[in-house]
Amino acid sequence: FDDEKWRPEVGDTEFFFFDRAFLENLVIAKYRLNQQDLTQDEFDILCKLAHGIASLMPPVDKYLYLDCSVSTIIEHMRQRGREYEDDLDLMYVYELKELYDEWAKTLPPERTLRINMDGGEYDLNEIVRFLEA
């Protein structure tokens, strides 16, 4: 397996955008570990695998963390109208939000813009300035 052929060459593009940071996926794995759906060994394997895959990806320059309350998350889920989200346990949403907040605290503050989405208003100019800096 030649991992070099999967890497984009420097200069191929000016901008990569991921709607999620790859390692953010470990938040779900951490939740599953807390629920005892994964053993510590399984979680450790997932972490090693995720970090290995992440090392093949372009490094993240900047993070936008969309933050909001659990009630806003629930409201957004209702607006999406996805059937499988209709019966989600409120405790699940609360615990997952706590884990995402823990993860966000590990991000480099100088490269992270935390945007409060409660109320639905945000300063687009602030976001653009952050991304262009």
Stretch-by-stretch model annotation:
Residues 17, 52-61, 102-113:
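A structural motif corresponding to the C-terminal end of an alpha-helix
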Residues 22-24, 68-73, 119-121:
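Conserved nucleotide-binding/hydrolysis micro-motifs of P-loop NTPases
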Residues 28-98:
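A glycine- and Lys/Arg-enriched "phosphate-lid" helix/loop adjacent to the NTP-binding pocket
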Residues 1-48:
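ATP-dependent small-molecule kinase phosphotransfer cores
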Residues 1, 5, 51, 98-105:
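Surface-exposed alpha-helical segments enriched in charged/polar residues
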Residues 74-133:
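NTP-dependent small-molecule kinase module
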